[in-house]
Amino acid sequence: MTTVPEPSAELLQRAGAVRLAAVDLGQTDDQQRADALQAMADALAERAEVIVAANREDLERSAAEGLAPALMARLKLDAGKLRGAIDGVRKLASLPDPLGRRQLHRELDQGLVLERISVPLGVVGVIFEARPDAVVQIASLAIRSGNGAMLKGGSEARCTNEAVMEALKLGLGRSAVAPDALTLLTTRQESLALLRLDGLVDLIIPRGSNELVRFIQDNTRIPVLGHADGICHLYVDAAADVDQAVRIAIDSKTQYPAACNAIETLLVHASIAPAFLASAVPAFQAAGVTLRGDEHSRQHGISDAATDEDWRTEYLDMILAVRVVPSMDAALEHIRRHGSRHTEAIATTDDQAAERFLGAVDSAGVYLNCSTRFADGFRYGFGAEVGISTQTLPPRGPVGLDGLVTYRYRLRGDGHIAADFADGTRSFTHTDLPL
């Protein structure tokens, strides 16, 4: 059984430094934080060759160790992917300030005015997979939202993560934000000890399996924002446009199969299965996708048999489970039983069927006639995401800047005391004022 160690003196010192830097960061203005992100982007561009070389080292070592192809795809950070990450930082810098937004403005009595204002969380701890571009996304989201961050990436990406973090800190050193606002955890012991840093860390965001999320929730007093498996479904309804549904299915599986928002199971209504699968099966085969079907779908060109395990497997690869269902009820029941509450989609031209599906599926994202690959903070216009939350409580779905802030009530008075309201000397007006 894995035990959670006490944090070392060195880790406590680093966490304390992040906490102090986060306090100062929370006092910076919008322009200072935007400038800090531009400086981070500049430093990443300057150190691009070093970062890409470090990534090649990680790739070579991981290939020799037999890392799965899906994880190798996530691990890769070439020059083009790095440029995209840098562009994302610059775009994030240009987004509206998430801090200082007045969400409520109410007069309680003459001269007694209540406000609710958005403020940073403080310090976030993020444990994520072997995806080094996630370091860039998470760090930039944290700084833009006024939060310090302690980051622990997959060990497969350790060289890349260290090179990226060095560049990010170099950029912060040229800005009004202290480099201590970010720190990188590099060992398993440190990531476990992070769970005991309540009082220094305000939120933990694990990006990984259900088992990882459950372990963290069971072993920390720090609030946890759960991001678990991405077992996403596309349901092809009886009234689907076949050509459109095939395009959506192909994109949802093949555009980036290692992503958590790629579909892992395709559900097809029995009445449209012959026509749909006649087009879809050759298209998937041409794209290099291995299909595993139930008994009914195997009557339409799928040779490999699916097992019960396939319905609950996140392949992150060019493998797709296919099931023919007799009704939408059966599709909804399958999703309830096997889904991970991430993202589900329906392809249909029937408005009534569409509204029923959109209302009945309890996932963070429910889509009509479009690819599940849109479940992404950048594509939602959030700039980037720190993760995708599959829990019911907010924030839910892709967590961007707005998911990394909380709020504070500010009350301004002029000698007001509660006793005057208790004895009837004064009375509340409760008048909403302009935001």
Swiss-Prot record:
Enzyme nomenclature, EC number: 1.2.1.41
Localisation: Cytoplasm
Keywords assigned by UniProt, alphabetized: Amino-acid biosynthesis, Cytoplasm, NADP, Oxidoreductase, Proline biosynthesis
GO biological process terms held by the UniProt record: L-proline biosynthetic process
Catalysed reactions listed for this entry: L-glutamate 5-semialdehyde + phosphate + NADP(+) = L-glutamyl 5-phosphate + NADPH + H(+)
Main location: cytoplasm
Pathway: Amino-acid biosynthesis; L-proline biosynthesis; L-glutamate 5-semialdehyde from L-glutamate: step 2/2
An example molecular function term from Gene Ontology annotations: NADP binding
Enzyme class: oxidoreductase
Disulfide bonds: none
CDD domains: ALDH_F18-19_ProA-GPR
SUPFAM superfamilies: ALDH-like (SSF53720)
Stored NCBIfam families: PRK00197.1 (NF001221), proA (TIGR00407)
Protein's job: Catalyzes the NADPH-dependent reduction of L-glutamate 5-phosphate into L-glutamate 5-semialdehyde and phosphate. The product spontaneously undergoes cyclization to form 1-pyrroline-5-carboxylate.
HAMAP family referenced in this protein's UniProt entry, alphabetically: ProA
Protein name: Gamma-glutamyl phosphate reductase
Originating species: Parasynechococcus marenigrum (strain WH8102)
